[in-house]
């Protein structure tokens, strides 16, 4: 009876119809450190062809690197051309590059506000527009934005950062409505309080205060973010579009 049950289970799994794995050409912007690096390494370990952008630091071992400033259209085009020559047109774009320049609203200059929007939101638009050309032709594409709980909750002193991250959600949903019929989807992974160079630089009072809102009562690690990205990049996620997946220990509770 045990053998029969095992055999039936195996047959059921085989008949389930899960799509076969396909190795894709992946580009992770800002993939040379922190969350971006963890994502790039995870996707490379899964046998995808992975390239990362950096701003002069070079690529980590095992990854193909291209220098790129996402605030510069010409630099974006050059980076994509290099990636295309190395591993083919980008099929999975992980838009992760970004900056933060926090300040009280009344002290935040327009220059500081605009600088963050340009890097985090307009930069994402630039790389998306460039990637979408070949994705539409191939009728396959996965666009994954690395957002933030800040873009859903709003966090004090981050009017610029929160606005940019919230904008990614609207952009992903607009793109999904426009391009899903061509096999191109856009989704957002929204990390919460993750241990990175950026969060370590925050005031200790802010770090301590953040834990009060996290049911898990701990800071997340960069290694806990790539799983959601891997899923959205996979064949299994073909019918998911315009979604926001929080990776925040329950901090935002889906807001």
From Swiss-Prot:
Pfam families: adh_short_C2. The keyword Cytoplasm does not apply. It is found in: Secreted, Cell wall. GO terms for biological process: fatty acid elongation. Keywords: Cell wall, Fatty acid biosynthesis, Fatty acid metabolism, Lipid biosynthesis, Lipid metabolism, NADP, Oxidoreductase, Secreted. GO terms for cellular component: extracellular region. The record marks 148 as: Important for activity. GO terms for molecular function: 3-oxoacyl-[acyl-carrier-protein] reductase (NADPH) activity; NADP binding. Its EC number is 1.1.1.100. NADP(+) binds at residues 33-35, 55, 69-70, 98, 161, 165, 194, 205. The active site is at 161 (proton acceptor). Its main location: secreted. The keyword Protein biosynthesis does not apply. Gene3D superfamilies: NAD(P)-binding Rossmann-like Domain. SUPFAM superfamilies: NAD(P)-binding Rossmann-fold domains. Homotetramer. Belongs to the short-chain dehydrogenases/reductases (SDR) family. Part of the mycobacterial fatty acid elongation system FAS-II, which is involved in mycolic acid biosynthesis. Catalyzes the NADPH-dependent reduction of beta-ketoacyl derivatives, the second step of the FAS-II elongation cycle. This is 3-oxoacyl-[acyl-carrier-protein] reductase MabA. It comes from Mycobacterium avium. The lineage of its organism: Bacteria, Bacillati, Actinomycetota, Actinomycetes, Mycobacteriales.
């Amino acid at each position: 009876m045990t053998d029969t049950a095992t055999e039936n289970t195996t047959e059921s799994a085989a008949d389930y119809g899960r799509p076969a794995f396909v190795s894709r050409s992946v580009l992770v912007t800002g993939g040379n450190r922190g969350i971006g690096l963890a994502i790039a390494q995870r996707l490379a370990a899964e046998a995808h062809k992975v390239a990362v952008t950096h701003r002069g630091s070079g690529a980590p071992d095992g990854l193909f690197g291209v220098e790129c400033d996402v605030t510069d259209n010409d630099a974006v085009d050059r980076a994509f051309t290099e990636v295309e020559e190395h591993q083919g047109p980008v099929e999975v774009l992980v838009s992760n590059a970004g900056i933060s320049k926090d300040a009280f609203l009344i002290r935040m200059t327009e220059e500081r506000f605009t600088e963050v929007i340009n890097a985090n939101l307009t930069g994402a638009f630039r790389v998306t527009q460039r990637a979408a050309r070949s994705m539409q032709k191939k009728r396959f594409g996965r666009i994954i934005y690395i957002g933030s709980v800040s873009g859903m909750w709003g966090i004090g002193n981050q009017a610029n950062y929160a606005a940019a991250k919230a904008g990614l959600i609207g952009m992903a949903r607009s793109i999904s409505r426009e391009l899903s019929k061509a096999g191109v989807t856009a989704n957002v992974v929204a990390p919460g309080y993750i241990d990175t160079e950026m969060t370590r630089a925050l005031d200790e009072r802010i770090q301590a205060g953040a834990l009060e809102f996290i049911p898990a009562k701990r800071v997340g690690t960069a290694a806990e973010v790539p799983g959601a990205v891997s899923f959205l990049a996979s064949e299994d996620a073909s019918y998911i579009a315009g979604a926001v997946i929080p990776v925040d220990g329950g901090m935002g509770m889906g807001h």
